[in-house]
Design a protein with these regions (language model features):
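N-terminal pre-catalytic "stem/leader" segment of glycosyltransferase-like enzymes
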Residues: 1-5, 17, 22-37, 163, ...
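A donor-sugar binding/catalytic signature common to diverse glycosyltransferases
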Residues: 21-27, 31, 41, 45-47, ...
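C-terminal "capping" alpha-helix adjacent to the active site of nucleotide-linked donor transferases
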Residues: 283-301
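Extended hydrophobic/aromatic segments used for targeting, binding, or gating
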Residues: 42-79, 173-230
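Donor nucleotide-activated moiety binding/catalytic core segment of transferases
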Residues: 2-16, 179, 186, 210-256
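Active-site-proximal region of nucleotide-activated glycan assembly enzymes
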Residues: 37-141, 297-300
C-alpha cells in the first residue's frame, strides 16, 4: 500500500510542478491521478479488432465516441472477424509449439545461459527470475497441459444437438480483468455463479486460454469439471466457432464477448467498462441477484 501511495503521490507532484495539460500513455496510477485532478488523459489502445487502435480517455480504456459512431451508422454490413482471429490462432500455435520436448531441449540451455549473463552483468533481469523457476517452468507447463487434456475432452461436435453457453477463460494476470473489470476479479467465482443459475437443460462450455496453461492450479480445473452442468472444451477448440455455435457467450470482459456482440449473438459480461454494452444484445451483470434472469434471456437466444 505504501508503494501504491508513493506512486500516486509522485504523479500528483509531477502534474502540479510541471503544470501538465495532457497526460499520455501512462499506467493506471498516472491515469487515475490525472483524472482526479481534471487533467485529460489519452492512451493509444488496441481495439482488439484487426490492427485498429483508438485513443482511450481513462484507465478503463473507455472512449465515448464508439457509441456515437455506432449510432451514426445508416447500415450495418456483415462483420468479417476471421482475419483478426487468425492472428490469435497463429500466436497460440507458436505457444503450443514451444511446449514440445525438442523445443524445450533447444531453448532451456539458452535461457539458463542468458540468466547467468544477466547475473554477471548485474542487470535487473538477473534478479527478476529464480534459476529454479526458470528450469522447472517448461516442465510444469507440460504437466499442466497433460492434466488439462485429461479433463478437457469435449469438442463442438459433442455439443451439436445441445444448448450451451460459452465461457472462454481469460489469461491472468491480464489488464482486461485486473484493470478494466474491478467489479469482478475472480473467474472461478463467476463460473460457479453462472453454473448455479443456468436454466435447466443448458450446459456451460468452458475453454482454457492456451496462453494460461500452467498459470492455474490443478484444483481450479478439478472443481470446475465437478459441476454437473459444465463441460470442458479441448484447448485446441476454435474459440470463434464456439461463439457461433453457443446460444450466448459469457466473460468478465474478454474479447470473445466482443466477437459475439459483433456477430449479433447474446453476450453477458461482468464489467461495466466494456465498449459494446450499448448494444441491445449485450448485457452487463451488475448484481449477482439479476444473473438468473439474464441467463434466461441469454439462453432464449
Amino acid at each position: 500500500l505504501h508503494a501504491l501511495a508513493e506512486s500516486v503521490a509522485f504523479w500528483e507532484r509531477e502534474i502540479r510542478k510541471k503544470n501538465l495539460g495532457l497526460v499520455m500513455d501512462g499506467n493506471k496510477f498516472m491515469a487515475a491521478t490525472a483524472g482526479s485532478m481534471g487533467v485529460p488523459y489519452r492512451r493509444l489502445t488496441l481495439a482488439r479488432f484487426g490492427t485498429y487502435c483508438y485513443w482511450a480517455i481513462n484507465d478503463f480504456f473507455d472512449h465515448p465516441g464508439i457509441e456515437k459512431a455506432y449510432n451514426a451508422l445508416e447500415d450495418w454490413p456483415d462483420a468479417e472477424i476471421e482475419g483478426s482471429y487468425a492472428l490469435a490462432a497463429q500466436k497460440y500455435e507458436i505457444e503450443r509449439h514451444a511446449r514440445s520436448w525438442w523445443r524445450i531441449a533447444a531453448s532451456l540451455p539458452e535461457s539458463i545461459l542468458r540468466h547467468f549473463y544477466y547475473k554477471v552483468r548485474k542487470m535487473e533481469k538477473g534478479d527478476s527470475v529464480f534459476l529454479s523457476d526458470l528450469v522447472t517452468s517448461p516442465f510444469r507447463i507440460r504437466n499442466a497441459q497433460r492434466h488439462l487434456d485429461r479433463l478437457a475432452t469435449a469438442g463442438l461436435e459433442d455439443l451439436a444437438e445441445k444448448t450451451f453457453v460459452y465461457y472462454p477463460l481469460q489469461k491472468e494476470p491480464e489488464a482486461t480483468i485486473g484493470q478494466t473489470a474491478p467489479e469482478c476479479l475472480s473467474q472461478h467465482a463467476a463460473i460457479l455463479a453462472v453454473a448455479r443459475d443456468l436454466p435447466a437443460g443448458v450446459l456451460l462450455a468452458i475453454k482454457e486460454n492456451i496462453s494460461a496453461v500452467g498459470r492455474r492450479t490443478a484444483s481450479f480445473y478439478d472443481q470446475i469439471v465437478a459441476l454437473k452442468n459444465v463441460v470442458m472444451l479441448h484447448p485446441d477448440t476454435l474459440s470463434l466457432e464456439a461463439v457461433k455455435q453457443a446460444v450466448a457467450t459469457i466473460t468478465i470482459a474478454g474479447t470473445a464477448s466482443m466477437e459475439a456482440a459483433i456477430l449479433g449473438k447474446p453476450t453477458l459480461t461482468f464489467s461495466e467498462h466494456i465498449k459494446w454494452k450499448f448494444l441491445p444484445h449485450a448485457r452487463v451483470v451488475t448484481c449477482e441477484s439479476e444473473l438468473p434472469s439474464l441467463l434466461r434471456w441469454a439462453a432464449s437466444g
